[in-house]
Amino acid sequence: MGNSFTCISHEQEQRPKKSSGGGGNNSGKYKYVRRLSLMPSFRRRTLLPSLSCSGSSSTSSSKKGGIKAKTKKIRERHHHHHQDHEKDSHIIQEQTLAATNLLFNQTPRNSNSVVPPSFRRSTSVVYPSAQPSGTSSGPVSAVQTPKKSSAGFVRSSSSRQRSSTDPMIKPNQLVDKELNKVEGSETKRFVLVHGGGFGAWCWYKTITLLEKHGFQVDAVELTGSGVSSIDTNNITSLAHYSKPLLHFFESLKPTEKVILVGHDFGGACMSYAMEMFPTKIAKAVFISAAMLANGQSTLDLFNQQLGSNDLMQQAQIFLYANGKKNPPTAVDFDRSLLRDFLFNQSPPKDLALASVSIRPIPFAPVSEKVHVSEKNYGSIRRFYIKTMEDYAVPVLLQEAMIKLNPPEQVFQLKGSDHAPFFSRPQSLNKILVEISQIPFKKSS
């Protein structure tokens, strides 16, 4: 049999087969075929013993007796093993119960007790309170946990002790440090006005950064811009285009002031609102915006540089909703030139956002002349932020506006395209915060 263990099947076939010789000495004998199951051998053997009927019966009986004896021994061995396993499990349970009782008896049962250190998750305190005056007796001393009134917080799952180099700055001091930057500001509320074709969506980075400094920020969406349902071709005046901004100022309290910030054509809307609500505007900030003088229109301003700005001429698409015999009703942008014209320094994700969000600019407000006075418009402190890599409103055009209508102070954003809220949001935020802190100059 080799290394295989053989078991005899309970079913046996005894097929009498006649000798091929037919008669003679082999006529009274038969050959028996037995089916044997071999485990764990993977092959089946077929034995063909030539046995008589009487010999086969005695051999089969003896083998059956041997199998029964082996089966009985296996069952007895398994029964003893099961009893030993139950005995071991019972001993383990008794030992566990004894250890639990011992631990319970050694732990003090009062309200001030603490969990033994061996069962306590290790922690370290960044700002630890005063050390306990005493420790418990015994080989293991109880560790007092920090109280809620202590100036600190628990650092989870760390047993590192505090080092002398660890700063003692509390979490709330980080916020206070940021808020200290705007303590000297006259107002803590910004109002943001988007440029032509843009919407309130373009200020999402600036809003986030200013709010982190503790400012309240409002982004106004002008008529026919962003999510406005009004058709741009139907806007016929600067007052109509600026209506949401005017409504905002009307809703302010009489003594409330804001810092007004405008971009691009939003500068013309700012000038219109500054003339109407001078007492509600603490400061006005023009970001590459149309800072118009009295009697000037945005179209007049851009016509000064239109001949030298080939990219602007290529990017602009005039719309004639009333027919080409009449003036244009709106100006759209060639989407394929947006990157080169407006967003040459902006991230691709912001370019993608602008590509699906920009709308046409109403032409009537662009061609309308603005009338401002020194008493109202001139009483508001103005600041200008130049964008130094701007191809839509080139630096020369920005400087021409500054020279014609000088502000109190001029700032520069290096590396910024026409959309600094995309290309240089951190730098823009820094300048806005700085402007909010500039105090009034004392008259000599």
From Swiss-Prot:
Residues 1-32, 49-90, 124-176 are annotated as: Disordered. Signal peptide: none annotated. Residues 65-82 have a biased composition (Basic residues). Residues 49-64, 149-164 have a biased composition (Low complexity). Pfam families: Abhydrolase_6. Residues 190-310 form the AB hydrolase-1 domain. GO terms for cellular component: chloroplast. Its main location: plastid. Putative methylesterase. This is Putative methylesterase 13, chloroplastic. The gene is MES13.
